[in-house]
């Protein structure tokens, strides 16, 4: 499976590490050369320097025959535009966009097809949901010593 990860911050780097270790064909896109070089040295990935929302950069990354694009930049708007552009080039590609601004959450969910999104992810919201879920277990915060 060919996967493109746009945005190589904490989320993008973690995805690159995990997915390349699982044997996926990974191409990274970022505007920072140093970030790309660091990830290419550490993981079995390809890299493209450029703006992930431009057709030129996406084509260099191989979007025309990619199976999945993960837009994980720090800018929600860029992630949406990147996903839409990728889908415009390759209508069969699946897209996942990181959307962190709560103002966009409902709107993006309702317009998922318009934005050509297979899935949206909000890491901060997911962390909050997981913490809330764990706190529902009565013994979660209780620690026993066995020594």
Q: What spans do the regions from the language model cover?
A:
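Cytosolic regulatory regions of ion transport systems
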Residues: 1-147
